[in-house]
Amino acid sequence: QQGGELAVEKKLYVERTLTGGKKELQPITASTQLAVGDKVVSRLTIRLDRAMDFVQLKDQRGACFEPMNSLSGYRWNGGIGYYVEIEDASTNFFFDSLSKGVYVLEYSYRVARSGQYEAGLATIQCAYAPEYAAHSASVKVEVE
């Protein structure tokens, strides 16, 4: 994060099934053990202190993750429309316009390979005013 006008936070959650069949999202930390086949939810929180046009968000994926929805296209969620581009190592979001406020995006992927990985970071930037940019932290993940 540079000046605070624009911020992005990335949190990863693993979906666990509790007794009784209820599903719960548990935050992923460096000590969380994942298994091949686990469903992981990436939650991206965007904060803007002013309205911005042509905002780009790139969410990098760890090499052990495969997106559950592999089709790119225009989406509508939480009152905002955006284009999603699914790539090999990242998911890109393109917003024509964002008003001041907080926005939360979520999408899911599956764990495909075992090993130790860096989950990747999220980077957000205003396309025609690149001085407005920020990035999130990343977390290490271990897959059995």
Feature roles, as predicted:
Residues Q1-E144:
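C-terminal segments of large proteins
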